[in-house]
């Protein structure tokens, strides 16, 4: 019900500090009151991106912070990417609806048939369209990483930002590594900046490097 006054009264007595959604509600109250501490926005990001399923608390907090220009669009899109990789369509749509509400209806299309979604488009001229392409490539990689890699290499890579391209190669590399494919490290080698990857993707890059005997990549 978002009864913030009642929540503020009860929250100090709440002992389960590991509830991410409650933490986001508390951050929302602090933000509304103007008492959100330094690092509060990052805490919301950490809670939100760690949740696999769609939620109200962190999604609402992220929406409020984004509307107030306190939350970078990149973090919202990264939440959408993480949700797409986890096959959580509602959570993906919720994130897209924050950053780009006018294209959130397209999430259903890229989930239903990512190859068709990518094949029906010639270009991605805007940030929103680029990110939808990234989401579609992530969904395609879950089913067919080789096809996703081919499309990224031949068509979409030049249209994406460096960060978008690196993240997508990381996801494709992870999916290849999950299948014990020898091509996994080839995909990860296309990531020129490791800081563009999530901790999870970095972990999979190390696993792929170990399997390939690429000790230089392991120590990087």
Explain the meaning of each model-derived region.
Residues 1-220:
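Alpha-helical solenoid repeat scaffolds
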């Amino acid at each position: 019900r978002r009864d913030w006054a009642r929540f503020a009264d009860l929250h100090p007595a709440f002992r389960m500090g590991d509830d991410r959604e409650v933490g986001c509600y508390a951050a929302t109250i602090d933000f509304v009151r103007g008492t959100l501490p330094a690092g509060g926005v990052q805490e919301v990001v950490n809670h939100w991106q760690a949740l696999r399923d769609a939620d109200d608390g962190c999604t609402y907090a992220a929406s409020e912070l984004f509307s107030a220009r306190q939350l970078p669009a990149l973090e919202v899109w990264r939440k959408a990417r993480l949700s797409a990789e986890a096959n959580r369509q509602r959570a993906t749509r919720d994130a897209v609806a924050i950053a780009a509400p006018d294209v959130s209806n397209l999430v259903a299309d890229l989930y239903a048939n990512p190859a068709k979604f990518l094949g029906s488009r010639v270009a991605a001229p805007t940030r929103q369209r680029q990110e939808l392409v990234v989401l579609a490539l992530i969904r395609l990689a879950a089913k067919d990483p080789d096809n996703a890699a081919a499309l990224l290499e031949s068509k979409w890579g030049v249209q994406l930002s460096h960060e978008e391209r690196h993240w997508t190669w990381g996801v494709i590399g992870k999916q290849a590594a999950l299948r014990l494919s020898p091509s996994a490290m080839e995909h990860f080698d296309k990531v020129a900046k490791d800081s563009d990857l999530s901790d999870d993707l970095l972990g999979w890059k190390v696993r792929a490097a170990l399997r390939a005997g690429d000790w230089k990549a392991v120590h990087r």
